[in-house]
Structures are given as structure tokens and as C-alpha cells.
Amino acid sequence: MSEGMRFLLDCHVASKEGKCSVKVADVKDFWNGQKEIRILDPNITACREKRDLMKQYRETGALLDFTQGLDIRCLNDEDIEDINHMRLRALHFAWDNPQDDLEGKFRRFAERFRRKSNIGMVYCLTNFNSTMKQNLYRINTLRSLGYDPYVMIYNKPSAPQEVIDLQRWCNNKIIFKKCPNFADYVPTRKQK
């Protein structure tokens, strides 16, 4: 679970499920040879038994979808090696808190991951304890490393127009590729 979501959901999820994932079953307990497995665990990377689970998922040979994403802060070299031997749908990560210096962790994953472009989508929470400078730093850093940043706006109705423009610029991949610098982006407004 991402830091921003952890903050927002702590009072609900953590009280029910705890802050760490716990292995409750082996893969063979639910997998009957299906070609695809959707893993709904909110943070498999925070599970003490992750090594065993990663091995089991890898050995199925099935197409894996970590629907809740992976926590870049918890991934180590062994995890990346396991991931490199899995058949995967798109990977998802989050960099919600700009105070977390995650550039090194994203760089390490990018260097060790088998794909060298389109590594995965990274959700970036904005309008929640972040400045535009911090937002742009995260977006530009992720793009330079081969990730696909995706802007999420906390409390969008009260967000400044600049943050809304940032979301449109970043999340519209045609615009994002044609206009690589947000300072050069000229948003169009609907006329009333």
C-alpha cells in the first residue's frame, strides 16, 4: 500500500488487516492451472513470507497481475530477480509522499528489471503536502528512468488549476510525449 493511501486508510484498513501482509494460503490452495492469476494482496512486498510466495507464483508459469501494485520501498534484489522470471501484466507502484526520497529505489529497480522501457506505472499523489516543484521532480525523474508517471489529485474539487493542468498534461500520454516540459504546456479551456 502506498504511503499516501496508508495515511488515508490507516484508521480503516490497518485496524482490520494490520500494517503487514500475512501469508494465509499457498498458491496451490487456490490455483488450478489457470493461465492468469490476479493477486489482490495490497502489499505482498511487506509480507514476511514473500520469498516463498514469489517463488510459488513464479513456478506457476501463469500470467501474473499484482492488481494492488508493488511497494518499491520494500523490494530488494532477490525480489527483482523473482519478478524478472515472472510473466507479468503491467506493474504498478506509487510515489505519494514527496518527502520520501525514492529516486534511488526506482533507479535500482529500473537497472535490474528486464524491461528497459515501459517499466511500469507509478501513481504520484498531488495536492497533499506537496509543492509543484516536488510534483514535477517526481514526474520528470520517473519518466527519465523509464516509468510511466500517473498523477492522482487529492481532494480535486479544491485543487489549484495548476495541479489540474499538471494531471491533464501528465496523464494524457499523447500530450506528455509531444510536450515533454510542463512549462511549455498550454492547456485549452472549454469556452462558456
Stretches found by the model and what they are:
Residues 2-7, 12-109, 119-128, 148-152:
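Core AdoMet radical
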Residues 58, 114, 140-143:
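Anion (oxyanion) recognition and catalysis
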Residues 112-120, 181, 188-190:
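Short, intrinsically disordered, low-complexity segments enriched in Ser/Thr and Pro
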Residues 127-192:
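Auxiliary Fe-S-binding modules of radical SAM enzymes
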